């Protein structure tokens, strides 16, 4: 399993994925990325229509448009947005790591000096 998959699974389990997704959507809207991608899609559709690639017999499918737009759209994401998201994910993972360590330490506190549990 890749680190990306592990992080994805963790954020889904903790409910943080929706927070991260909302943050990403907000930042992409604020920086104008969504408008740029919308314009990119329009331009591609216009180019295909002018070139005769899109006719009444042969339509560009959504999948084809997504395949063409995705690499370009990813390069348009500002570095500041990428860094902010990465920092947010690291914070979430660090908090989880700290909580896991704190819970483990609490278990050890239940034992007295002789190694027997206090009840």
From Swiss-Prot:
GO terms for cellular component: cytoplasm; DUBm complex; nuclear periphery; nuclear pore; nucleoplasm; SAGA complex; transcription export complex 2. It is found in: Nucleus, Nucleoplasm; Cytoplasm. This is Enhancer of yellow 2 transcription factor. Residues 96-119 have a biased composition (Acidic residues). One of its GO terms (molecular function) is TFIID-class transcription factor complex binding. InterPro entries: TF_ENY2, TF_EnY2_sf. Keywords: Activator, Chromatin regulator, Cytoplasm, mRNA transport, Nucleus, Protein transport, Transcription, Transcription regulation, Translocation, Transport. One of its GO terms (biological process) is poly(A)+ mRNA export from nucleus. The keyword Magnesium does not apply. It comes from Drosophila willistoni. Residues 93-119 are annotated as: Disordered. Belongs to the ENY2 family. Component of the nuclear pore complex (NPC)-associated AMEX complex (anchoring and mRNA export complex), composed of at least e(y)2 and xmas-2. Component of the SAGA transcription coactivator-HAT complexes, at least composed of Ada2b, e(y)2, Pcaf/Gcn5, Taf10 and Nipped-A/Trrap. Within the SAGA complex, e(y)2, Sgf11, and not/nonstop form an additional subcomplex of SAGA called the DUB module (deubiquitination module). Component of the THO complex, composed of at least e(y)2, HPR1, THO2, THOC5, THOC6 and THOC7. Interacts with e(y)1. Interacts with su(Hw) (via zinc fingers). The gene is e(y)2. It comes from the Eukaryota. Involved in mRNA export coupled transcription activation by association with both the AMEX and the SAGA complexes. The SAGA complex is a multiprotein complex that activates transcription by remodeling chromatin and mediating histone acetylation and deubiquitination. Within the SAGA complex, participates in a subcomplex that specifically deubiquitinates histone H2B. The SAGA complex is recruited to specific gene promoters by activators, where it is required for transcription. Required for nuclear receptor-mediated transactivation.
